[in-house]
């Protein structure tokens, strides 16, 4: 295995938009493996609702039957914020090429990422479409039709927007969390 797609994120909660991204990535013929990497701590967010161990558990349940998909707890096990550059360097010890998958909503802050200039030399960016955000030609565009975000979902949790394999568990968790914050 030489080529991977790295799809990192908070996944707080995981939703059908994340599943749609994985389905679109599976169509890339040169990707040997898709690695989903939940963050321990997102540098652009102040907190998480679901603990990292629970987010990893949900993702593993959702994608357990996908042969080319692995849910990695590498960043979670570091018990700290892990810059993407660090994760990329770690993975390049085992793989030759990395497609780094981000949502179009991340483009506005991309140049603020830790060691962005070095990172763009190490990975090929793949940008999932979202909210009609224009994707510059320097990136590979990944067409995804789901109009959903984890933030919107936390504010108005809907079973229909959650992955079927653990929808009820995720729904119940966020319903209870929402009640605590009201």
Swiss-Prot record:
Source organism, top-level taxon: Bacteria
One Pfam family per UniProt: CTP_transf_like
Nucleotide-binding found in the keyword field: yes
GO biological process, one term: NAD biosynthetic process
Keyword Nucleotide-binding: yes
Annotated function: Catalyzes the reversible adenylation of nicotinate mononucleotide (NaMN) to nicotinic acid adenine dinucleotide (NaAD).
Protein name: Probable nicotinate-nucleotide adenylyltransferase
Organism: Sulfurimonas denitrificans (strain ATCC 33889 / DSM 1251) (Thiomicrospira denitrificans (strain ATCC 33889 / DSM 1251))
Organism ancestry: Bacteria, Pseudomonadati, Campylobacterota, Epsilonproteobacteria, Campylobacterales
């Amino acid at each position: 295995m030489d080529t991977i797609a790295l799809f990192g994120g908070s996944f707080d909660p995981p939703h059908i938009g994340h599943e749609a991204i994985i389905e679109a990535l599976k169509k890339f013929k040169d990707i040997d493996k898709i690695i989903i990497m939940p963050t321990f701590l997102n540098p652009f967010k102040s907190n998480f609702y679901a603990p990292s161990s629970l987010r990893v558990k949900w993702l593993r349940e959702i994608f357990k039957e996908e042969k080319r998909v692995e849910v990695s707890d590498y960043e979670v096990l570091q018990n700290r914020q892990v810059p993407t550059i660090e994760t990329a360097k770690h993975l390049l010890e085992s793989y030759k090429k990395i497609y780094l998958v981000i949502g179009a909503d991340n483009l506005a802050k991309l140049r603020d990422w830790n060691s962005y200039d070095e990172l763009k030399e190490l990975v090929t960016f793949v940008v999932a479409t979202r909210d009609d955000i224009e994707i510059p030609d320097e990136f590979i565009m990944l067409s995804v039709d789901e109009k959903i975000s984890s933030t919107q979902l936390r504010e108005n949790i809907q079973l229909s927007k959650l992955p079927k394999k653990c929808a009820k568990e995720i729904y119940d968790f966020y319903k209870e969390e929402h009640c605590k914050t009201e």
